[in-house]
Structure formats: C-alpha cells, structure tokens
C-alpha cells in the first residue's frame, strides 16, 4: 500500500491526482492510500485511510464505515487509533496500564467485528521524543505500546496474543492491593493465545477462566475471577 498524501493534510485534488498517478505508474501492483483525519474527504486513491480517535473508553471502538468514507465501494483502513487519547507511561499504576491495554482491545475488536475495515493500526508502537509544548513535560509522548527503549507495556501483549507463532500469556494485574483505589482489585484480564487458561492458587485448581466479551478478536482476552472468589476458595481449602 503506497501513501500518496501528506499526513493528515487537507484535500488538494490537483496535487493528489498527480501523486496517485505517479504511484500507480511506478508500481501498478500496489494500491494507494493517504492518511486522513477528515471524514468524507475527496477519495482519489484506492483505500480510504482514516485516523479514528473516536474511542474514549466509553464510546464505540470505531466509527461505522458509512460515516467516514464517501465511497462504500472502496476499502477503509484505520491508520491510527488510541495514542494521545490515553497516554500511558510504563511506570503508571496498574489500573491505568490495564485501561490502556483494554482501549486497544476495544478498537481492534470493533474493527474485526464490523467486517468493514481492511485493517487497523494502533498509534503507536513506541514512545517517542517530541518538542517542549507536546508530550508530558519531559519531551516524550507516551503513546506507544512499548517504551522508548523497546520494553513492552501491558498493551503490547494485546497485539502479541493475537498471533500464533509463539505462546503468549500476560496477566493485567499484579494483584497488589496498594495499586488499586480502596484496595479493591476489580476485574483483571489475561491476554493469551491459548485455547484455555486455568487458574491455580497454591497448586490447587480454582477454575478455568472464561473469555471476555471481545469475541471478534482471533484470541479474546480471558477474565480472571474476583479476589472475593479467590479468598472464598482459600477458606474452603484451609
């Protein structure tokens, strides 16, 4: 896929007609596109690429195709999502890092479920340096699923777990009550490409975890049992 528009630029039909033609002349085997922040802008390329930052943790994961592209007969690609909507440092507390991961889950699941998206790219792979008026006061944008040194954050496991080449299993919570408001652990998730995840406590089988609601993904996250459930199970085996 060749990008033939300046990133997030406004329409310029004369210029972009020419760039589209040149790309096709140089490589007839690949489709063309161009990253937009605009809905229903002039589509001269083969694929409408759109930065969909509509998900805020509560809203749907992705906008419907009919609300974004002017041509339903051409493919729609989500070229960016999340990123600045929920900056996350690797040293943020557990609930923040979990919500960061779940936002990527929700958007990817929505893109899969719709059947209308050719693909969905999260913004972005790595944290990156920026100027003094952007980022977190330290000239760093914490938009990545990995940090600047390529160390994975929890959200990286969301993407790793969708593949089948290597076994992946990452628990979203450290289960430390001091990382959670009022010491309440709440719901935790397991990001894995396993067919089943079984929970043991002190070598005693507790339960097989159920899959989460995001079933459009190739490998939906698993939902852990509650801390209360674990305590009750511990009491039964004391």
Regions from the PLM with identified roles:
Residues 172, 200, 225-227:
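A structural detector for beta-sheet-dominated domains
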Residues 1-151, 155, 162, 166-179, ...:
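Substrate-binding/catalytic cleft of secreted carbohydrate-active enzymes
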Residues 214-227:
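Aromatic sugar-binding surface patches on proteins
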Residues 228-235:
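Conserved small/polar residues in nucleotide/adenosyl-binding loops
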Residues 187-208, 231:
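Beta-strand-rich binding/interaction modules
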Residues 207, 213-214:
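A short acidic/small-residue loop/turn micro-motif
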